[in-house]
Amino acid sequence: MDPSKYRPSSSFNTPFCTTNSGAPVWNNTCALTVGSRGPILLEDYHLVEKIQNFTRERIPERVVHARGASAKGFFEVTHDITHLTCADFLRAPGVQTPLIVRFSTVIHERGSPETIRDPRGFAVKMYTRGGNWDLVGNNFPVFFIRDGTQFPDVIHAFKPNPKSHIQENWRILDYLSHLPESLNTFAWFYDDVGIPTDYRHMEGFGVHTFTMINKEGKANYVKFHWKPTCGVKCLLEEEAIRIGGENHSHATQDLYESIAAGNYPEWKLYIQVMDPDHEDRFDFDPLDTTKIWPEELIPLQPVGRMVLNKNIDNFFAENEMLAMDPAHIVPGIYFSDDKMLQARVFAYADTHRHRLGPNYMLLPVNAPKCAHHNNSYDGYMNFVHRDEEVDYFPSKFDNTRNAERFPTPLRIVTGQRDKCVIEKENNFKQPGDRYRSWAPDRQDRFINRWVKALSEPRVTHEIRSTWISYLTQADRSLGQKVASRLNIRPTM
């Protein structure tokens, strides 16, 4: 008998209850006791098994992006970009690739409201013929920091106070006051887009700079953008309070019910493309995650569309055990030297092994759908039946060989080993440009959110003054208005 053919599955359900080992259970409502009112007997194995399984149902939640919802669908190429990449799933218009998407909030726990002001995760796993490609992004195109070394600190600052377990603005503003580059992300965070109406009306961004390579080996920097065809919609504070008070899972429910009703959400995928030889032409570093690439300088190019047309079958199996990883790339798409991306390439697999175990890639939602082969064996919860005798490479007893070489970026890297910030910081131009692009009422809401945050009692005069200095450098009138409402004199 091949045990791999008889894995536990709902398709093998019997019409009566059984133990985990398959033995029939004739009474699933009463414990085995001495008499009708006597003590429970330890030999009631079914009771012990049932309770012990129940107390182990929960796994560690994600350290970030714990609250989320998933859906399945497909990606379809609509425009030919083979001059930019040799990626197989982008080989021609009309090609479709199955995928799963997970939307999420970032900071709070698994059961937290979906109406809080918080960045949203926008992660896509495509099951391509050449392996899984994961694009693990957010609903903002920028991030608060530009170096992965700072990631634990910025998350700690946003997480609840370890003493009181209350999220407090003084901690956020204190930490990020040391990082003026964070102001550009605050121009999104404290903007109206800080609370999306739901997941269907939300943009997605790859955030990082990636590299595309064509079959000739030519490499270009790219950024990825997801644009919802139904438009972007956001909640103002009063709406968020009302909706969150009625339903803390409103975005999950909206996504699930929309797909169930046949109202399939759709996004268009666009890219921005930059020749690495031209990066010095701009006043920002293209590998800086705190910066956008202005679309008037580097226009969007259409690539394809994503349609979510199927709800997940089981929330735990396809949402909680779903493991996205920016290290999962395919030939034709590669990393860049973006410091945040480089750190994430290591971090995700590490946290998945902690949360799900060393064999998390064997779980159906994570496993590639294409043929694959490796010599990763055994470990906790390895449920794959393998009968090879050779578990090493190379071998004269096994004909496994190296794959055909595919193009990767080739360049010479020279320099002195050092820990340093990038040379081209330019921290205030982009947030100032964004602020000035808004209508007056939108500007006023942005100012009010800053005033509310900076008015918290534990935000010191020094921290307030620092932020007013940053806001003034972005836009003089912005800094003056915030300072005036706080009764503080600007230093610039």
Curated annotation (Swiss-Prot):
Q: Which Pfam families match?
A: Catalase, Catalase-rel
Biological processes per GO annotation: hydrogen peroxide catabolic process; response to hydrogen peroxide
- EC numbers, comma separated: 1.11.1.6
Q: Which GO terms describe its cellular component?
A: cytosol; peroxisomal matrix; plasma membrane
Task: Cite the entry's keywords alphabetically.
Answer: Cytoplasm, Heme, Hydrogen peroxide, Iron, Metal-binding, Oxidoreductase, Peroxidase, Peroxisome
Protein's recorded name? Catalase
**Enzyme type, top EC level:** oxidoreductase
- Single GO term (MF): catalase activity
